[in-house]
């Protein structure tokens, strides 16, 4: 059966994903055979989808893409300025199930971490947790690049002198 987009599909993820007549996302039998259950779980029930206000000084935004497959990932972090702890994380991903799952898992992983600890996360950790096949390792690399870009954006906002009128 071909994937369909209905008004019930999750537009926040911007990926064509199969839904049934009731608008419930379903994983096909082919998907279940090709992906680890953790990928399917994060793909069908992604965590922390959405946006934060990028204009806020304590929000960092990382936007990365993979030219090889066309996946694009935006990950945003909200940081407690006094503690350096990531208080909230949101993502939007245009891409395959592995890219969506990698984004979703990354948001769960970094929430509550310090910026230094979050910057140390490697794609291999994500790939191992989700049991990604070698052909999908670029998806976990996107998640690593996205968190590093978000941290860099947050830090650049903190180091920018303010203009006084």
UniProtKB/Swiss-Prot annotation:
Residues 1-27 form a transit peptide. GO terms for molecular function: 2 iron, 2 sulfur cluster binding; ATPase activator activity; ferrous iron binding; iron ion binding; zinc ion binding. GO terms for biological process: intracellular iron ion homeostasis; iron-sulfur cluster assembly; tRNA wobble uridine modification. Keywords: 2Fe-2S, Iron, Iron-sulfur, Metal-binding, Mitochondrion, Transit peptide. Its cofactor is [2Fe-2S] cluster; Zn(2+). The keyword Transit peptide applies. GO terms for cellular component: cytoplasm; iron-sulfur cluster assembly complex; mitochondrial matrix; mitochondrion. Changing residue 63 to S: In ISU1(LVF/SSS); no growth and abolishes interaction with both JAC1 and NFS1. Pfam families: NifU_N. Residues 132-136 are annotated as: SSQ1 binding region. Changing residue 72 to S: In ISU1(LVF/SSS); no growth and abolishes interaction with both JAC1 and NFS1. The keyword Cytoplasm does not apply. Pathway: Cofactor biosynthesis; iron-sulfur cluster biosynthesis. Disruption phenotype: Cells deleted for both ISU1 and ISU2 have decreased activity of several respiratory enzymes that contain Fe-S clusters. As a result, cells grow poorly on carbon sources requiring respiration and also accumulate abnormally high levels of iron in their mitochondria. Knockdown of ISU1 in ISU2 knockout cells reduces cell growth, decreases cytosolic tRNA thiolation, and increases association between SSQ1 and GRX5. Binds 1 [2Fe-2S] cluster per subunit. Zn(2+) binding stabilizes the monomeric form. It is found in: Mitochondrion matrix. Belongs to the NifU family. Homodimer, but can exist as monomers or trimers. Oligomerization may be regulated by Zn(2+) availability. Component of the core Fe-S cluster (ISC) assembly machinery. Interacts with YFH1/frataxin with a 1 to 1 stoichiometry; the interaction is direct. Interacts with the mitochondrial co-chaperones JAC1 and SSQ1. Interacts with NFS1. Interacts with YAH1/ferredoxin; interacts with the reduced form. Scaffold protein for the de novo synthesis of iron-sulfur (Fe-S) clusters within mitochondria, which is required for maturation of both mitochondrial and cytoplasmic [2Fe-2S] and [4Fe-4S] proteins. First, a [2Fe-2S] cluster is transiently assembled on the scaffold proteins ISU1 and ISU2. In a second step, the cluster is released from ISU1/ISU2, transferred to glutaredoxin GRX5, followed by the formation of mitochondrial [2Fe-2S] proteins, the synthesis of [4Fe-4S] clusters and their target-specific insertion into the recipient apoproteins. PANTHER family: IRON-SULFUR CLUSTER ASSEMBLY ENZYME NIFU HOMOLOG (PTHR10093). Present with 10800 molecules/cell in log phase SD medium. This is Iron sulfur cluster assembly protein 1, mitochondrial. It comes from Saccharomyces cerevisiae (strain ATCC 204508 / S288c) (Baker's yeast).
